[in-house]
């Protein structure tokens, strides 16, 4: 194989390894929603999946409404959203 072909192959492999974790994220679509504290004022500690950081992070949940990217524990968030 020529050096140009090897460079192309190396470039494609590099691109594939960079994009694979994002495209293989098998969690539900709601795991990509931003954290939504809701309108209430109970100030509960909750966790949401941050797709940019690829991890579950803590936020303050007001106790009502919000969205489905809202978990009581980091473990539950990880179990649902990280595949």
Curated annotation (Swiss-Prot):
Q: Which PANTHER family match?
A: BPTI_KUNITZ INHIBITOR DOMAIN-CONTAINING PROTEIN, KUNITZ-TYPE PROTEASE INHIBITOR-RELATED
Q: Name one GO cellular component term.
A: extracellular space
Keyword list, A-Z: Disulfide bond, Protease inhibitor, Secreted, Serine protease inhibitor, Signal
Q: Where is the BPTI/Kunitz inhibitor domain?
A: 31-81
Question: So what family is this one in?
Answer: Belongs to the venom Kunitz-type family.
Its name, as the record gives it, is: Kunitz-type serine protease inhibitor bungaruskunin
Functional summary from the UniProt entry: Serine protease inhibitor that inhibits trypsin, chymotrypsin and elastase, but does not inhibit thrombin.
A Gene Ontology MF term for this entry? Answer: serine-type endopeptidase inhibitor activity
- Name the Pfam families for this protein: Kunitz_BPTI
* Signal peptide bounds: 1-24
- Whether Repressor counts among this entry's keywords is no
Q: Which organism is it from?
A: Bungarus fasciatus (Banded krait)
Family annotation (Gene3D superfamilies): Pancreatic trypsin inhibitor Kunitz domain
Q: Which domain of life is it from?
A: Eukaryota
Q: Which InterPro entries match?
A: Kunitz_BPTI, Kunitz_BPTI_sf, Prtase_inh_Kunz-CS, TFPI/VKTCI-like
Describe tissue expression.
Expressed by the venom gland.
The record's disulfide annotation reads 31-81, 40-64, 56-77
Keyword Coiled coil applies: no
Query: Which residues are listed under the site Reactive bond for chymotrypsin?
Result: 41-42
Where in or outside the cell?
Secreted
